């Protein structure tokens, strides 16, 4: 049922044109989709993004990154006492940086690279495709994704870095 919600959201309208999208608006749209789910599990979902940040990307790709990363974080925090997920978007002169932080268990030491491989999962009922899909999309835009422990939330902190410009 949960995966059907995601599929229905992504099918809602065509988002396949490479164009400048306002990332704050796109985050709010994805956030609206998650509101019922996070409320039912008492999860705090925060988005931090300046209203003026835009990036040239297919909207379907941006939404797929965000949805897969939030879904991954959701699975990590839903059984915990302190349930928080934060998505922060910032930019430098040359890059867009998206941070996905959660208060889950974090990534097991030594698994930082292999979790991005297809069918690798640390979850009991996981398929192991979400992070691989994100990695493929990020690399399509000549970007990078990495993970470390969140200093503030103590779970995982995924960092997506995408170059600006027409590379």
Predicted segments, located by residue:
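Conserved DHp (HisKA) dimerization/phosphotransfer helix of two-component histidine kinases, i.e.
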Residues: 1-37, 42
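Acidic ATP/Mg2+-coordinating residue in the GHKL
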Residues: 102
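Short conserved segment of the HATPase_c
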Residues: 107-119
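Short alpha-helical Gxxx[C/S/T] motif in the catalytic ATP-binding
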Residues: 130, 134
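Conserved glycine-rich
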Residues: 143-144
């Amino acid at each position: 049922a949960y995966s059907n919600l995601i599929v229905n959201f992504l099918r809602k309208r065509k988002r396949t044109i490479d164009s400048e999208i306002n990332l704050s608006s796109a985050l709010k749209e994805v956030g609206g989709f998650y509101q019922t789910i996070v409320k039912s599990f008492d999860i705090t979902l925060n988005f931090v993004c300046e209203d003026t940040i835009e990036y040239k990307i297919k909207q379907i790709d941006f939404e797929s990154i965000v949805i897969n990363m939030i879904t991954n974080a959701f699975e990590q925090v839903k059984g915990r006492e302190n349930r928080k997920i934060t998505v922060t978007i910032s930019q430098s002169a040359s890059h867009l940086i998206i941070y996905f932080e959660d208060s889950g268990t974090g990534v097991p030491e030594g698994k930082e690279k292999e979790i991005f491989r297809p069918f690798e999962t640390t979850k009991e009922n996981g398929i192991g495709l979400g992070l691989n899909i994100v990695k493929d999309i990020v690399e399509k835009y000549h970007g990078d994704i990495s993970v470390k422990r969140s200093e503030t939330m103590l779970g995982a902190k995924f960092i997506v870095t995408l170059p600006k410009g027409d590379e």
